[in-house]
Regions:
Chain A
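The feature captures the beta-strand-to-loop junction immediately N-terminal to the Walker
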Residues: 104-106
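Helix-to-loop junction immediately C-terminal to a conserved catalytic motif
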Residues: 119
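Q-loop/switch helix immediately C-terminal to the Walker
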Residues: 146-161, 171
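Conserved ABC ATPase "signature" region
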Residues: 155, 167-185
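Conserved ABC ATPase signature
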Residues: 189-196
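Catalytic Walker B motif of ABC-type/P-loop ATPase nucleotide-binding domains
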Residues: 214-218
């Protein structure tokens, strides 16, 4: 790998993690010039070095973030049984504006069920959900129409939210670009998209129309590593914009940056 | 109204991309027509309208089944349930009329003078009216397309095999095609056939529309455990 | 070699402070000082993250300087905290090494 290629890749990786690349790339460039070494020998792969830089820069103490005002989503005492099996037993969940809640738990612990109940797609056996604003939902898969193009999806969902055609297309396309999907406007019918790309569409449709509460059920299925990082960057971005977000996730790397973790594994403290 | 139109537009786009369905829609009724063309021509009229009814209701079945995946999301996005199924019906009715027109012209030219043209037009219009609600009703009640297709196949087969004189035959959705058809092809037939046919078609339409409305509204209902702050 | 890498991992940041005690410097030159001191080649991938950590902890202070020839370089120097840390950690290290030597001595 040439030094220029390596430095360009490093720059991209740092940018993806919202780190200004100028300093680290400048220093690395100077080091390579002085020493004349192969960049992979001196620094390792660009992605790994970027991680090391981030680790060096990251503030170790988490920001204390108190809940602000009334929760946008308050679920109380949610219980759901399927036959004899109790999937959810009196679960409570509160999410405020500008807060990210990660919902974790083993397979079958009811994460998707809980999210669907909060979205209003499923009725619990008991319990109540109070919503303070519009809701957007992104299921693990599905939620798209095989024979429509992404643009057509944007218009369709946008119209429901009262967003005009051109505006809906523009918003959908810009969200696609933020998820590293620049040629969404030129894409054909969604049945021809790869699984990961289709999930990007799914995520965008959940967010279209700027709902106040976002319920995301492992929406990153099939995302490559870069897009996965882009997705979380978007989540922090939406949090800063005051959205209340619930993300169901198996993957634990981002947990130190979310505000609250709700563990649905039976027996764990809530 | 605007939202319903957007649903209709997208449903039309979807159907137009399903090449297989479109070819079937276009050509299957033709096969039905010519299957009886040699013998009594009046059978051709009945069979072609059954062909149109069957393929259009099958197209509606596919459209309804395919929409299940996205409908919950559309509800969350702010559509009312009636906008969803009315939009889809509007698209299917449009497709049906576009399909029926060439067949009307075919019958006009092919059976010129032998049939009452206005009655033929009425049969085709009523068939196009009834078929999509039938297909969507089957889709709403049966989640899987295969079972739905078998139901429609059974209906069409029974429609062809059951003696129309039997009272039981009136339970079948396209019975009115035979009734009005009698008026269309028999010079001696009275206009009361038309009246009975219209009544049957009207009742069938209302029943299937009600099934679609009820089943869809139930499936996509606003749940009682949610309240807005 | 692996053992050596592990030892180095534990004291690299102190060694960097030590190298800077001899005067301010920039990345590549710090690496050369460490190599000249017998620590072997320090990869850039290891050195710069360590410098970033030291900077974040306030033990070194950095500033960019435009050179007479070539592009800007980031220069590092010990802060007062850094100098103090070097002295006290250095003392702890000496005690530690002494104990390790004593245990490892073959009787």
């Amino acid at each position: 790998m040439t030094a220029d290629d390596w430095l360009a890749a490093l720059s991209a990786e740092l940018r993806r993690r919202r780190i200004d690349p100028a300093g680290p790339v400048g220093e690395a460039a100077a080091h390579l010039r002085d020493g004349g070494q192969d960049p992979l020998e001196a620094f390792g792969p660009p992605a790994a070095y970027a991680l090391a830089v981030v680790a060096g820069l990251r503030d170790a103490t988490p920001r204390p973030r108190g809940p602000s005002g009334e929760p946008r989503l308050r679920a109380t005492g949610i219980t759901k049984r399927y036959g004899r099996r109790t999937v959810l037993n009196g679960v409570d969940l509160s999410v405020h504006a500008g807060e990210v809640v990660a919902m974790i738990g083993a397979n079958g612990s009811g994460k998707s069920t809980m999210l669907r109940i909060c979205a209003g797609l499923l009725s619990p056996d008991s319990g109540h959900v109070r919503l303070g604003g519009t809701v957007g939902y992104c299921p693990q898969n599905g939620g798209t129409s095989d024979f429509l193009t992404p643009d057509e999806h944007f218009v369709l969902v946008g119209a429901g939210r009262g967003v005009g055609r051109t505006e809906a297309r523009a918003r959908g396309r810009s969200m696609a670009a933020a998820l590293d999907w620049a040629d969404a406007p030129r894409a054909g019918q969604s049945r021809h998209l790869s699984g990961g790309t289709r999930q990007k569409l799914n995520l965008i449709l959940g967010r279209l129309g700027d709902p106040d509460v976002l319920l995301l059920d492992e929406p990153y299925q099939g995302f490559d590593n870069g897009t996965y990082l882009d997705f979380w960057q978007q989540v922090w971005h939406w949090r800063d914009a005051g959205k209340a977000i619930v993300v169901v996730t198996h993957l634990l790397n981002e947990l130190d940056r979310v505000d609250t973790v709700l563990d649905l594994t039976p027996g764990r403290a809530r | 109204m605007k939202k319903t139109l957007v649903v209709a537009e997208m449903a039309l786009r979807e159907i137009s991309r399903r090449r297989g369905v479109l070819i079937l829609l276009a050509l299957l009724p033709l096969a039905f027509y010519y299957s009886r063309r040699g013998e009594a021509y009046w059978q051709s009229v009945r069979f072609v309208s059954l062909g149109i009814g069957w393929t259009l209701s099958t197209a509606a079945l596919f459209a309804g089944s395919a929409a299940r995946g996205i409908e919950p999301r559309l509800r969350i996005a702010g559509y009312a349930t009636h906008q969803l199924y009315l939009g889809r019906l509007a698209a299917l009715w449009t497709v049906g009329l576009t399909l029926a027109l060439p067949y009307y012209l075919l019958i006009l030219v092919d059976l010129d003078g032998k049939v009452r043209n206005d009655a033929i037009a009425l049969i085709l219009v009523l068939t196009v009216a009834v078929a999509p609600p039938l297909g969507l009703a089957v889709a709403a009640l049966l989640p899987r397309e295969l079972e739905g297709m078998l139901v429609l196949l059974t209906i069409v087969a029974m429609q062809m095999m059951l003696d129309p004189e039997k009272t039981a035959a009136q339970a079948l959705p396209f019975w009115f095609t035979r009734e009005i058809g009698t008026y269309a092809v028999e010079s001696g037939a009275g206009a009361d056939h038309v009246g009975r046919g219209l009544a049957h078609a009207g009742a069938t339409l209302v029943v299937f529309l009600a099934v679609v409305a009820l089943a869809t509204t139930l499936r996509l209902r606003r749940r009682s455990h949610i309240s807005m702050a | 070699m692996d053992r050596r890498t592990q030892w180095l991992r534990g004291v690299l940041d102190l060694c960097v402070l030590g190298a800077l005690a001899r005067g301010e410097s920039y990345g590549y030159e710090i690496a050369q000082r460490l190599e000249a001191g017998g620590l072997g080649v320090i990869a850039g991938g290891t050195l710069y993250p360590a410098l970033l950590r030291l900077e974040r902890l306030g033990l070194v202070v950095a500033d960019w300087r435009t050179g007479a020839s070539g592009p800007a370089r980031k220069y590092y120097r010990l802060s007062d905290d850094g100098a103090a840390t070097l002295r006290s950690a250095g003392a702890d290290w000496a005690v530690f090494v002494g104990n390790v030597n004593a245990i490892m001595e073959v009787p």
